[in-house]
Amino acid sequence: MTEHRVSVNRVTDAFGLSEGPHWDQRTQKLYFVDITNQYIRRLDPATGEVNSAYIKHGPVGVVVTVDDTPDKLVAGSGRDVILVSWDGDENEANTTIEVLCSVDTDRNQTRINDGKVDSHGRFWLGTMANEVNGQVSPNEGTLYRIDDKLEPKTEVTPVSISNGLAWDKEDNKFYYIDSPTRQVVGYDYDPQAGTISNKKVIFDLNKTELQGVPDGMTIDTDGNLWVALFGGHHVIHVNPKTGKLLRKVKIPAENVTSVTFGGPLLETLYVTTSGYNLTAQQRKTTPYAGAVFALKGLGARGILANSFKMNQ
């Protein structure tokens, strides 16, 4: 398929560190987080309206829907996994939350970053060191798996900036990004046990001319990955079986943070970007950094996002 048929449209205002898009097929709405501004935001693509819930608890790294519950979300805020009571229909300044469990309990300088729910309703989320003067201490993070017992289990440690994750539709492969490595790795996946094994590098940016580091990612029904490049101005499309770069799509922001498919047929790729800590020059050249963009005409379809299964 040729590049020129792809349209890239801005669908929200520019926010701060927009990240972690999660498509809710039930409501046809897109949730995402604005990490440092401490908001969960919800876009209604039909109207363009964005509603926001302020999370006083701390920076919000990730948000997912909860199974069979229209007005509850689960998010990672600071080092806590929290239950958020919000139906998304209006702005909320005093959002009600409940702490479900905590991770990195032996550390105090880390926070939850990206995460996703697997086919059995378990929440996988990872941590990273807090940014200090633009720097993140290496090897302070961990990737965890949390089921309905709310007891975090360690899957990968140490990592530096735990980021994108995806499972293939056959549910026997798990893909993962620790951003500073500039690699996407694949594992064999056991969906019953929720365990991973046999790590293998499936794409290495260090062996390409691509700029930036891999950040968030998603997978399509063909089993190919879509990866956001933070500092790289692009979303890349990668075949994890061959390690081949299939194509790249330029985004009007340098720091592209994450991607997910949405829309009734899961054919629109929603792309989050960051407007956080930009120089005056960057703001001038990319005034819409921090916005969400919608890519259409890619000729690919996504896989439904899972919701967290809780004992309620």
Model-derived features: positions:
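Beta-propeller domains
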Residues: 26-55, 78-83
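A short loop-to-beta-strand structural motif that recurs across blades of beta-propeller domains
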Residues: 39-41, 80-82, 134, 141-144, ...
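Short loop/turn segments immediately following beta-strands, especially the blade-tip
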Residues: 84-92, 187-195, 240, 296-302
